[in-house]
Amino acid sequence: VEWLQAQGIEEVLSDECTNVIVPWNIQSGKNNCMFMAHLDTVFSEETELMIKEKKGKWCCPGIGDDTANAAILLLLIKYVHEKVKKRSCGVWFVFDVGEEGLGNLAGSRKLMESYGNRLRWVTSFDLYTHHIYTSSVGSYRYRIVVKTKGGHSYLDFGNKSAVAEMAALIHELYGYQPVGAGHTTYNAGVISGGTSVNTIAQECSMLYEARSDEAEALVECENYLYETLKKRKTDDVQIECKKIGERPCMGVVDTEKIMRIAQKCSDLIEKVTGKRPAFGQASTDCNIPLAMGIPSLCIGLIEGAGAHTLEEW
């Protein structure tokens, strides 16, 4: 905010989600677009964020997803305010939050709630130039907790272990065979529990997700999850499950418009980098506008790799 104001940009707003919003030439009706980049990363606050240069590359956790794109968006705002004449289309430039991890696209949801009925287009700047994401991947996310009696590893041997029960549950969940023509995946992402090496665990928790480009496939995956949990519950094994995130799949949207603009972006990227990006699908801030029928595109402005790793560049 301070940097933007130092460039002479006076109107810098924020909302209850802490999105930072810079309106420019906003028009009535749906004669407006939105360009956004997210500020959050997957890394904890304890992660060392020291930028290091290695073989001509800038390396730092979170630098490509999505800090560098956000920095370029700052320069784009400065350029537009200084060089571009106002025209018939307005723009909201946004630095949003909640894109990563369990953020559940909170920033994008709030933006679409506030401005969605006035938008004809949304672009999210995220990741790298070698891909353009023209469609969305939805997801369901859950926190699952298994509880058992537990006890001493020797004296109470034979008592149910929450860790062992969770392992058996995961094994069964990984036996699921997705149905439908779409691409569906599932993942046990985080597991925690137990007390010590000589304790039969009383509690074990897991973060689990399912992803698909088809809404029906997500529902089928969820049904299998709930059926499996019900089957594994006994008097000695308690299982709790809470849905903690839901990213919608694509709604009814003008795909021809999306592909037309994607082709133009692809031509420009190839002209600058010499490499033509591939079209694909992903879970991004665009999930929310696409679910609402607003044509949207996710595109990267940088070259890089290693997203979500400590070696990111």
Task: Name every feature range the model reports, one short phrase each.
Residues 19-20, 187-194, 209, 238-259, ...:
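A short beta-alpha structural unit
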